[in-house]
Amino acid sequence: VNASLVTPREVFAEALKYNAVSVVLLHNHPSGDAAPSHNDIAVTDRIVQAGKILGVQVIDHIIIGDNTYTSLKEKEYM
């Protein structure tokens, strides 16, 4: 598996269930490379926009690789 699709509906289901006001997204890259793909950035933007509509702030999206990570917030992708 080299890709996985996630929808805003899936992301925010638990957040809304517990009346959360913010979330942090986190996923791994089995390849070990923590660099965000174009799809990672596009999906993050979509989820951030959905969060604004729902009133749930997306604080960060962190990608885990081999002994490293990338914060999309730190890299200013969001």
Q: Where do the protein language model's features map onto the residues?
A:
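Active-site-proximal loop/helix of nucleotide/amide-processing enzymes and allied scaffolds
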Residues: 1-78
